[in-house]
């Protein structure tokens, strides 16, 4: 089958398959002196430039409180010199309307140079700066269409703050101008979940409670909080991972097929699925959610400190670095099927996978092989690293007698296509510039996820002794209580 470019085989650089941006544009990055800009945004734009996707006329304007000139700004990045010629910098006080008037003058000069008012404002700043920036963009008229605004997680700290942020956003920008970015939705392997489900009838027919026993989603990191202690102390892992990445992956695995893959149809089904998740019973929360915090331990052969010993972390901090939970989706497709989710820092390895575990056979016809000893069929989506899909099934062992053995049939992107997968930010920045909202979150996306998790957060805050996190040694798969969460149901976490 040929792609949109008429190619039967992907080029070595899959970015060359992406649509070229024809219209000139400008992108203004607030927080341009920060880590996200250096690690992700500028490298992604540079890759789009080198792949020939960006138009001849465009500009990248960095804006931050740090004082520096264009030359110093450009020197921060390892990028194509021709790309860097399109980059400039202005120092901005986010709280000062006069500073935004100077910003507007600079933008107007750049707009004349490219002959286009197609503008993107990217807020790569802490969440407490969102509202003053949005207000000052409005005061200077920079919020008018066709301008678009991109905001990063966390989208608020709870339901109330998320609604305040959304009220401000929608006071100054219309919904089709707002792009709430969750970079996990930009990953090629995450999007492949949809193709696997909805382009293969054989799998979609068994994707329900008649055949599926349970689903496991694991997002593990071997690193600690690193230089993000200040941020993490105010957020914690439930807000940082579950409110966005984890629930979005869950939605892709469990949602109903949209009538077409366009922005609204796709997002409607995603939200519908999230609304079907059963609320957690706060009075028996310990039976549904396990909270953990890493202690001292050994990761990858190296001794590492406990979370409370990390620079910038309070010595008596109760912030969680690990969460495991069980939840149910109350709809026809998934009624009765438990979903087990876990994520944590300082675990043995970095891996993100989704495992759809099917029911065991009802009866074994093989002598000496009880049905409960036969491992069930499992479909595994490995989202990172070594991205791919595996199907685990039983085969006959090559020996006398009928002895089944579990094997895995593996597809790996790199092995089959032999191409470099685009970074999530490359895809998502392209979509923002083109105005395609499909892979971005809507307001109701955010609110329904906060409605689910808000009671949990409030319970933790109201009774810190009862819900104090269990300490687990760094380099292990979390506290023992996380194992008990799934073992009480007669199941076990997959060995990763």
From Swiss-Prot:
Pfam family, one: G6PD_C
Gene that specifies this protein: zwf
Enzyme nomenclature, EC number: 1.1.1.49
Family: Belongs to the glucose-6-phosphate dehydrogenase family.
Function: Catalyzes the oxidation of glucose 6-phosphate to 6-phosphogluconolactone.
GO molecular function: glucose-6-phosphate dehydrogenase activity; NADP binding
Domain of life the protein comes from: Bacteria
Keyword NADP among record annotations: yes
Cysteine pairs bridged by disulfides in the record: none
Residues the record lists as binding NADP(+): 31-38, 65, 153
UniProt name for this protein: Glucose-6-phosphate 1-dehydrogenase
InterPro entries the UniProt entry points to: G6P_DH, G6P_DH_AS, G6P_DH_C, G6P_DH_NAD-bd, NAD(P)-bd_dom_sf
Catalytic activity: D-glucose 6-phosphate + NADP(+) = 6-phospho-D-glucono-1,5-lactone + NADPH + H(+)
Top EC group: oxidoreductase
Active-site residue list: 245 (proton acceptor)
One Gene Ontology term from the biological process aspect of the record: pentose-phosphate shunt, oxidative branch
Binding site for substrate: 183, 187, 221, 240, 345, 350
Phylogenetic classification of the source organism: Bacteria, Thermotogati, Thermotogota, Thermotogae, Thermotogales
Pathway it works in: Carbohydrate degradation; pentose phosphate pathway; D-ribulose 5-phosphate from D-glucose 6-phosphate (oxidative stage): step 1/3
Keywords, in A-Z order: Carbohydrate metabolism, Glucose metabolism, NADP, Oxidoreductase
Cellular component terms per the entry's GO annotation: cytosol
């Amino acid at each position: 089958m040929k792609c949109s470019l008429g190619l039967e085989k992907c080029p070595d650089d899959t970015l060359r398959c992406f649509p070229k941006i024809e219209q000139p544009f400008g992108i203004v990055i607030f927080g341009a002196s920060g880590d996200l800009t250096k690690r992700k945004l500028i490298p992604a734009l540079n890759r789009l430039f080198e792949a020939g996707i960006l138009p001849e006329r465009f500009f990248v304007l960095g804006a931050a409180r740090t004082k520096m000139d264009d030359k110093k700004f450009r020197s921060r990045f390892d990028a194509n010199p021709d790309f860097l010629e399109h980059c400039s910098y202005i120092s901005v006080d986010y709280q000062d309307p006069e500073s935004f008037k100077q910003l507007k003058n600079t933008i107007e000069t750049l707009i004349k140079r490219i002959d286009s008012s197609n503008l993107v404002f990217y807020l790569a700043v802490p969440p407490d700066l969102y509202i003053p920036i949005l207000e000052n963009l409005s005061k200077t008229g920079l919020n008018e269409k066709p301008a678009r605004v991109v905001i990063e997680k966390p989208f608020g700290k709870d339901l109330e703050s998320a609604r305040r942020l959304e009220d401000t956003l929608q006071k100054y920008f219309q919904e089709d101008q707002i792009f709430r970015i969750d970079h996990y939705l930009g990953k090629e392997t995450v999007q492949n979940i949809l193709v696997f489900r909805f382009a293969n009838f054989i799998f979609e027919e068994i994707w329900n409670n008649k055949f599926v026993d349970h689903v496991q989603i694991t997002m593990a990191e071997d690193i600690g909080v690193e230089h993000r202690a200040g941020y993490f102390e105010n957020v914690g892992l439930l807000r940082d991972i579950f409110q966005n990445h984890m629930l979005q992956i869950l939605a892709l695995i469990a949602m109903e097929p949209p009538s077409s893959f366009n922005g609204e149809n796709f997002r409607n089904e995603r939200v519908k699925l999230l609304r079907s998740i059963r609320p957690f019973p706060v009075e028996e929360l310990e039976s549904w959610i396990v909270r953990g915090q890493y202690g001292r331990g050994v990761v990858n052969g190296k001794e590492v400190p406990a979370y409370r010993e990390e620079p910038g972390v309070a010595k008596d901090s109760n912030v969680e670095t690990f969460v495991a939970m069980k939840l149910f989706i109350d709809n026809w497709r998934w009624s009765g099927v438990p979903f087990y989710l876990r994520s944590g820092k300082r675990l043995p390895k970095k891996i993100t996978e989704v495992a759809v575990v099917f029911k065991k056979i009802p009866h074994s016809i093989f002598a000496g092989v009880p049905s409960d000893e036969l491992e069930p069929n499992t479909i595994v989506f490995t989202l990172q690293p070594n991205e791919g899909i595996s199907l685990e099934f039983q085969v006959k062992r090559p020996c006398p007698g009928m002895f089944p053995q579990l094997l895995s049939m593996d597809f790996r992107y790199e092995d089959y296509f032999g191409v470099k997968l685009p970074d999530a930010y490359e895809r998502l920045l392209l979509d923002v510039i083109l105005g395609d909202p499909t892979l971005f979150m809507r307001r109701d996306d955010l609110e329904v996820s906060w409605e689910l998790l808000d009671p949990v957060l409030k319970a933790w805050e109201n009774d810190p002794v009862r819900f104090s996190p269990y300490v687990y040694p760094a380099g292990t798969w979390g506290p023992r209580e996380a194992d008990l969460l799934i073992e009480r149901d007669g199941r076990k976490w997959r060995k990763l």
